[in-house]
Swiss-Prot record:
This is N-acetyl-D-glucosamine kinase. Zn(2+) binds at H157, C177, C179, C184. InterPro entries: ATPase_NBD, N-acetyl-D-glucosamine_kinase, ROK, ROK_cs. GO terms for molecular function: ATP binding; N-acetylglucosamine kinase activity; zinc ion binding. HAMAP family: GlcNAc_kinase. The gene is nagK. Catalyzes the phosphorylation of N-acetyl-D-glucosamine (GlcNAc) derived from cell-wall degradation, yielding GlcNAc-6-P. Pfam families: ROK (PF00480). Belongs to the ROK (NagC/XylR) family. NagK subfamily. It catalyses: N-acetyl-D-glucosamine + ATP = N-acetyl-D-glucosamine 6-phosphate + ADP + H(+). It comes from Aliivibrio fischeri (strain MJ11) (Vibrio fischeri). GO terms for biological process: N-acetylglucosamine metabolic process; peptidoglycan turnover. ATP binds at residues 4-11, 133-140. The keyword ATP-binding applies. It comes from the Bacteria.
Length: 303
């Protein structure tokens, strides 16, 4: 039995999956954002409850909005203040008496897609989230790749390529990022970036959904903005694909619902890739909000 926990800023979602990777239990509880001891106790209590229900000790995986320090094991997270700087994996292991896997929520999202029935034989899957922020996860042979310092897949904090900067024009905005740097992809390719760029070029605040609606209605500014953004995506994605050469790319987050992306990227990408490179298959993520808990559970599949 595989147990997954998607630990968010307001709730913890639990899911249990059997050996066929079918979900057999679901539960949601509020996140203890201020009391770390209660946070650990809540997770441990759910584990004990479902161990008793299924009569086995489930393998435990946690997905978090942050990362674990590769040297110390301390958590780096801002969405769950109680867990910041704490040793959640180690403390939970001590409490339940078994090993626990932990990874960031973007890797869990990617892992969930990689273990979809249709994709599970793909040698490599890249998950990219175009939501409030922009981030990603890298899956090789069914396992999340976290890297030496546990920052592999933090694609949102790679910088805008120089050709993307030129594409944005003479008055291109140098956008700041929450990480303290400027020019991070997170600030440009996210839904937030989509809106910020529109406001920069047209002097008007609009929500992404309204820009997309205006584009469908033929609004001149929206059409120009979407065309510019699609080319920006193609340039930046080509940069990432040249580095990692994934077989499949699964897109999640609010902007992934913009169907034009799946028409435009395959047409625009080739001119930005090496001549010998192939455009990977680009699909919309299938598992939506359940991706985090699925991926957390599947951290243990290859053990």
């Amino acid at each position: 039995m595989y147990y997954g926990f998607d630990v968010g800023g307001t709730k913890i979602e639990f899911g249990a999956f059997n050996e066929k990777l079918e979900r057999v239990a679901t539960e949601r509880i509020p996140t203890q954002t201020e009391n770390y001891s209660l946070l650990v106790d809540d997770i441990a209590s759910l584990i004990a409850k479902y161990d008793a229900e299924f009569g086995v000790e489930g393998k435990v995986g946690l997905g978090i909005p942050g990362m674990e320090d590769a040297e110390t094991g301390a958590l780096l997270t801002s969405n769950v203040p109680a867990a910041k700087g704490q040793f959640l994996r180690k403390d939970l292991e001590a409490k339940i008496g078994r090993s626990v896997k932990i990874d960031n929520d973007a890797n869990c999202f990617a892992l969930s897609e990689a273990w979809d029935e249709e994709l599970k034989d793909s040698p490599s899957v890249m998950g990219l989230i175009l939501g409030t922020g922009f981030g990603g996860g890298l899956i090789f042979d069914g396992q999340a790749f976290s890297g030496y310092s546990h920052v592999a897949g933090e694609l949102g904090h790679s910088r805008l390529p120089i050709d993307a900067w030129f594409h944005l024009g003479e008055n291109a905005p140098l956008l700041g990022c929450g990480c303290g740097n400027k020019g991070c992809l997170d600030s440009y390719l996210s839904g937030r970036g989509f809106e910020l760029l529109y406001a920069h070029y047209y002097g008007e605040q609009k929500k992404a959904i309204d820009i997309i609606k205006a584009h469908a209605e033929g609004d001149v500014n929206a059409v120009e903005h979407v065309d510019r953004f699609m080319e920006l995506l193609a340039i930046c994605f080509a940069n990432l694909f040249t580095c990692f050469d994934p077989h499949v790319v699964a897109l999640g987050g609010g902007l992934s619902n913009f169907e034009l992306i799946y028409e435009e990227l395959p047409k625009r990408l080739p001119k930005h890739l090496l001549s010998v490179a192939r455009v990977p298959r680009i699909i919309k993520a299938k598992h939506g909000d359940s991706g985090g808990v699925r991926g957390a559970a599947f951290l243990n599949i290859k053990d």
